[in-house]
Curated annotation (Swiss-Prot):
UniProt entry tagged with the keyword Cytoplasm: no
Bias type Basic and acidic residues, positions: 17-40, 49-73
GO molecular function: 4 iron, 4 sulfur cluster binding; catalytic activity; iron ion binding
Cofactor: [4Fe-4S] cluster
InterPro entries referenced in this protein's UniProt entry, alphabetically: Elp3/MiaA/NifB-like_rSAM (IPR006638), Methylthiotransferase_CS (IPR020612), rSAM (IPR007197), rSAM_horseshoe (IPR023404), UPF0313 (IPR022946), UPF0313_C (IPR024560), UPF0313_N (IPR013704)
Listed name of the protein: UPF0313 protein MA_4618
Binding site for [4Fe-4S] cluster: 452, 456, 459
SUPFAM superfamilies from the UniProt entry: Radical SAM enzymes (SSF102114)
Positions of region (UPF0313): 129-742
Region Unknown: start-end pairs: 1-128
Species this protein is from: Methanosarcina acetivorans (strain ATCC 35395 / DSM 2834 / JCM 12185 / C2A)
Residues of the Radical SAM core domain: 438-707
Length: 742
């Protein structure tokens, strides 16, 4: 499974120059700009505000005291590459401003509000969550309302906060509705009708993962809700919220985003219902999906709606998913059936250009009935998630056709710096009377980079953030750290520095700029690729400078360390042991059976043993007593009872017994979930064993906790079933003692 071959010929990454199929510039329409054109309409998403307080700038409104110039060196995000390979024109001829407001679907003119809000209350540092907060800012209406399944925490570890601040920075008036009631639309009406659109997210995690255990039982805690309370978001939050919004405001555009919408953008296996569900845009009454890290996409959408475009015509933004009518799709396919490419180009140039840029995968009807077709569809779209060479994907559904545009490019270093230095308060909204546990975990942490080239089969980060690493500059991270030290509750400890993985900061590959991450091989599996720059030099410099900041006593890594990478740089490993571990280092070998680690695309136990030896040696050298805490997994595709017994024996022999154990949970768009549903490796076509029986899954988990008296019966039954009763008795090698069954 390590080598993932590509079966289709890729086109080059050269932008299409045919003006007929690129987004037309509106230079000739300068005299027809909308009344409320925003700051940041030049070339970038984030343009430093230079209007003076109290004077009207490009917003057409008073700047309301927020006109401080940004510090030098904070670059904006360029929009120049947004549509350079666009295939379908948003509309023929010049775009006309929608009569009833940007993006709306009615022809009626909106009535102007006669009453203007005014208040002597100071404007909150937070984005508004109530009509009173909107009023305190002197606003008549909001441009965009973000709806989320999480509590509102204004911290850069929370997706809603990032999107809200990015839109605010681009000049839009943004409000947030967090964890609304979903039995009726009233909560969704409290901030009124947004002028542009609603954006809907389930929160930082898929709502099914937030609400349910791997055994599909309700969770007892929800770290993203005040006081760990459960029941504050529905299952399938994105669909439910969208339906309630449509009831309240039938003609307001809805844009979906976040992890739940992103990873359900195609027909997908749904663990709760144990069946294949339609793409989320086929189930939710929404207009677009923003997939992946959505800063570039969401601001481009906002600007184009602001300019008067109909959201139904916005079809060329990378990193978005849109719907096509079944009839239109059939007509497009018919036009593209020319006897050869030249004929098709002459008779139906639009269709020919479309099929040059998009690939059709098996339809919902096919993948829901044929597991081999599901695996084929998965393999195709998995290999097209490269922002440099990836093509768009088309998947027909019974009542609509889902079209995913090619992925959006990653942010540059300067852009990422800018995003993470926006004016987050770093706190939960003051309306909450109980703490948000998820904030407590990251409050004094620093995000250094995005992306992960680890390639673990069960992880969706690659599909959401991409394999290519984008790192913040050292100076940007230091500026944020300095602000942390100024907080009154800072105790001198920075408890996390990293990203999806702690030690990929500053790493890269010489091929990424031209072709993106390789499609025919993984970066770390079955071994670290020699073309990868695995130097930890930049990370070491950052950690050293963080330690030297006044007021900082300790800087801990906090995030998971990729130990196969750490072995590539002994200087990093020594520094890690000397300065950056608080007593325990958490790593994730996940399993010790080769068959299972191969299915997971994880390094095997020999690599783990090398790391353990080095870790012990460096701890001895620096005179510290520190320990490894292993994260392990049961029930992963490819894992049998024999594999779990092998794991238990390894833990017995190496003293690695741990409580940090999780059952495999199938979540959309991961390789492991594809294997779980189909029983096939999507890259080789080989069959994969999958434990789906609840009893066997319980036995697998029990074997990792074989010492627990509560698991005796399950462990005994597993050993008996596997023919390993030699491990029952009083001998040293035995996992459990022989006794009469209770």
């Amino acid at each position: 499974m390590g080598v993932r071959k590509q079966t289709m010929v890729k086109d080059t990454a050269v932008p299409i120059e045919n003006k007929k199929f690129t987004r037309e510039k509106k230079d000739k329409e300068k005299d027809k700009k909308p009344d409320r054109e925003r700051a940041g309409r030049k070339t970038g998403f984030f343009v430093p505000k230079k209007v003076e307080t109290g004077k009207k700038g490009k917003l057409g409104r008073k700047s309301e005291g927020k006109a401080e110039e940004k510090a030098e060196g904070k670059a904006g995000i360029s929009t120049s590459t947004i549509s350079e390979r666009a295939v379908l024109k948003p509309s023929a001829g010049k775009r006309k401003k929608a009569e009833s407001g940007p993006g709306t679907k009615t022809g009626k003119k909106e009535k102007k509000q006669k009453k203007s809000f005014s208040s002597s209350l100071p404007a909150s540092k937070f984005l508004p969550m109530s009509p009173e907060e909107v009023k305190a800012r002197g606003w008549k209406e909001l441009d965009i309302i973000l709806v989320t399944g999480d509590a509102y925490v204004d911290h850069s570890s929370f997706g809603t906060a990032i999107i809200g601040r990015v839109l605010e920075d681009a000049g839009f008036r943004v409000g947030i509705i967090a964890q609304p009631r979903w039995d009726n639309p009233e909560d969704l009406k409290k901030l009124g009708r947004p002028r542009l659109f609603f954006s809907v997210s389930a929160g930082n995690t898929d709502s099914m993962v937030s609400n349910l255990t791997p055994g599909l039982k309700p969770r007892k805690k929800d770290a993203y809700s005040p006081g760990n309370k459960t029941g504050l978001r529905p299952n399938r939050s994105v669909i439910i919220y969208s339906n309630r919004i449509k009831e309240a405001f039938p003609n307001v555009p809805i844009v979906l985003g976040g992890i739940e919408a992103s990873l359900r953008r195609f027909a997908h296996y749904d663990y709760l219902s144990d069946k294949v569900r339609q793409a989320i845009l086929a189930d939710a009454p929404a207009d677009l999906v923003v997939y992946g890290m959505g800063e570039l996409q969401i601001v481009e959408i906002a600007k184009r709606l602001q300019a008067g475009e109909d959201i139904r015509k916005i079809r060329d933004i990378p990193g978005t998913v849109w719907k096509m009518e079944v009839r239109a799709w059939k007509e497009l396919k018919e036009k593209g059936k020319g006897t050869n490419e030249a004929v098709a180009r002459d008779t139906a140039p639009e269709a020919a250009e479309f099929f040059k840029e998009y690939i059709e995968i098996p339809s919902f009807s096919e993948v829901s009935q044929d597991k081999a077709a599901f695996a084929k569809a998965f393999r195709t779209y998995f290999l097209e998630q490269n922002p440099i060479t990836g093509k768009g994907i088309v998947q027909p559904h019974p009542k609509t056709v889902i079209v995913q545009n090619r992925p959006m490019r990653p942010l540059t270093e300067a852009e990422l710096d800018h995003v993470y230095e926006l004016p987050y308060t770093g706190e939960a909204h003051p309306s909450y009377t109980e703490p948000i546990p998820a904030l407590e975990m990251v409050k004094f942490s620093l995000t250094t980079h995005r992306g992960c080239f680890g390639g673990c089969s069960f992880c969706a980060i690659t599909q959401h953030q991409g394999r290519m690493i984008t790192s913040r500059s050292i100076e940007s991270v230091l500026r944020e750290a300095k602000k942390l030290t100024e907080k009154p509750d800072f105790k001198g400890i920075i408890n996390g520095v990293g990203g999806p993985t702690a030690n990929m900061y500053g790493m890269g590959c010489r091929s990424w700029e031209k072709q993106g991450a390789c499609l025919d091989k993984a970066c770390l599996y079955p071994r670290v690729c020699p073309a990868l720059d695995t130097s930890h030099k930049k990370l070491l410099e950052l950690m050293k400078r963080l330690r030297e900041l006044p007021g900082v006593k300790h800087v801990f890594t906090g995030y998971g360390v990729r130990y196969d990478l750490a072995l590539e740089d002994e200087e990093y490993l020594e520094e890690l042991c000397t300065h950056h571990i608080s007593g325990q280092l958490r790593i994730a070998p996940e399993h010790f059976s080769k068959r299972v680690t191969d299915a997971m695309s994880k390094p095997g136990k020999k690599v783990y043993e090398r790391f353990s030896e080095k870790f012990a040696a460096f701890n001895k050298k620096c005179g510290k007593e520190q320990y490894i805490v292993n994260y392990l997994m049961s029930g992963h595709p490819g894992c049998t009872l024999k594999d779990m017994i092998e794991m238990a024996e390894y833990l017995r022999d190496h003293g690695g017994y741990t409580e940090q154990v999780q059952d495999f949970t199938p979540t959309p768009m991961t390789v492991s979930t594809c294997m779980y549903y189909t029983g096939l490796d999507p890259f080789t076509g080989k069959k994969v064993y999958v434990a789906k029986d609840k009893k066997e899954k319980a036995m697998q988990r029990a074997l990792m906790h074989y010492r627990s008296p509560a698991n005796y019966e399950l462990v005994y039954e597993a050993l008996e079933k596997a023919g390993r009763l030699d491990l029952v008795g009083n001998a040293h090698k035995c996992l459990i003692r022989r006794k009469e069954k209770q």
